[in-house]
């Protein structure tokens, strides 16, 4: 490491102010911070010093996604190899086949499942990262500021929220929209009012709905095959619930399968166990707000319970209880990773409770009442992002009025 440190120290003058490569300093800076902690020192007389800086915070969040990421790759392989064996077609039908064939299509081998999932997920993640970091570098050079480590988190969250069969050009287009439109045009990290990863996914959801939703996109190789065996469905539990309610859910899936993650879905959203590990890490390090998490759970519980009480003979989603809402769709993934994003969420303590409740209520309303969107977590969080400044303003004004009233007494 001393050799690398000396190498960076020798090269730094060329990239610093007045150097021959001054305008490319953001590129140098991102590689330096990749290997070493920032060497910047506080220069202003008024400051707050904390061991948990932005770089370390983003690294922790990135590492917290690993349980969901690795289980997601396993689940892609598990679901897909089972399907390919069912139709007796040991070939995905596209370029992935040449890589998958290194270990083979035997569905009962653990390494085959992990490898199959990696063959589909890693190209999506790599595309997302490379395209996104290119935009970050471009804007950093134009604005002459350092590259923030927040993109490492945005890229992995975007990739984990995508189906495994997503075309790579769409992954590139989605992260481009999320970074450029969702963040950079507002000034970059810390100034965006929408979650960049969700903004990119929402763009794909409305621009290319057949590739981001439906029954075929959740299992790799399914879209390449012309034959679907009788009685087989790639539908997610949420899609089944929207069509046939709790009876359909329990007929095709057990609650524990949904909790463990042995179901079709986006790469990182299926396993509540893996997501819970991440939640514990983020809460223990105080990166995520427990107020937002509890508020979201409370809003979901109350709203779904009210719909259960009201009931409906025509809409089966009315009767789906809260414990099913928790384990199907992207509720848990959005709750832990997306809703707690500090920049686009509420900043006051009371505001975080309200913000979380708004998400919990809205996601159930979209799932139950709106037949066009069986999955509501993405739209619920983006809607709450828009309300976050208003919520914080109301909380601050309420505190001012309360203090004025006490002062006048």
Regions found by a protein language model. Name each.
Residues 146-227:
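Membrane-interface helix-loop-helix junctions at boundaries between adjacent transmembrane segments
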Residues 190-276:
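Long hydrophobic alpha-helical segments that form multi-pass transmembrane helix bundles
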Residues 1-121, 125:
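N-terminal signal-anchor module of multipass membrane proteins
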């Amino acid at each position: 490491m001393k050799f690398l440190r000396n190498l960076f120290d020798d090269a730094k003058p060329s990239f610093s102010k007045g150097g021959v490569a001054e305008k490319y300093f953001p590129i140098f800076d991102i590689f330096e911070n990749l290997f070493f902690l920032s060497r910047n020192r506080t220069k202003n007389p008024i400051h707050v010093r904390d061991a948990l800086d932005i770089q370390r915070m983003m690294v922790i969040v990135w590492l917290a996604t690993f349980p969901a990421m690795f289980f997601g790759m396993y689940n892609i392989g598990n679901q897909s190899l089972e399907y390919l064996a069912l139709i007796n077609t040991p070939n995905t039908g596209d370029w992935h086949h040449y890589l998958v064939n290194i270990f083979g299509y035997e569905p009962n081998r653990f390494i085959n499942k992990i490898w199959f999932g990696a063959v589909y997920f890693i190209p999506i993640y790599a595309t997302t990262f490379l395209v996104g970091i290119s935009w970050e570098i471009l804007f950093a050079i134009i604005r002459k500021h350092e590259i923030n480590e927040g993109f490492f988190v945005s890229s992995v969250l975007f990739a984990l929220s995508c189906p495994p069969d997503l075309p790579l050009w769409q992954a590139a287009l989605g992260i481009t929209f999320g970074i450029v439109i969702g963040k950079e045009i507002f000034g970059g990290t810390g100034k965006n009012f929408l979650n960049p990863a969700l903004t990119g996914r929402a763009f794909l959801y409305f621009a290319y709905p057949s590739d981001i939703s439906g029954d075929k996109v959740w299992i790799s190789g399914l879209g390449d095959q012309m034959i679907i065996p009788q009685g087989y469905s790639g539908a997610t539990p949420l899609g089944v619930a929207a069509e046939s309610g709790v009876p359909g859910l329990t007929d095709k899936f057990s609650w524990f399968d949904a909790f463990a993650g042995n179901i079709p879905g986006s790469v990182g959203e299926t396993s509540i166990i893996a997501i819970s590990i991440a939640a514990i890490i983020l809460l223990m390090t105080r990166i995520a707000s427990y107020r937002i998490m509890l508020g979201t759970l409370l809003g979901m519980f109350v709203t779904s319970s009210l719909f259960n009480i009201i009931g409906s003979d025509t809409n089966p989603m009315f009767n789906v209880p809260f414990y099913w809402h928790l384990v199907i769709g992207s509720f848990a993934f959005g709750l832990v990773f997306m809703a707690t994003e500090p920049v686009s969420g509420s900043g006051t303590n009371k505001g975080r409770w309200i913000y979380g409740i708004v998400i919990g209520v809205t996601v159930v309303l979209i799932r139950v009442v709106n037949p066009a969107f069986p999955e509501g977590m993405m739209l619920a969080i983006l809607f709450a992002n828009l309300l976050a400044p208003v919520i914080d303003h109301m909380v601050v004004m309420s505190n001012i009025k309360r203090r004025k009233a006490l002062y006048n007494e």
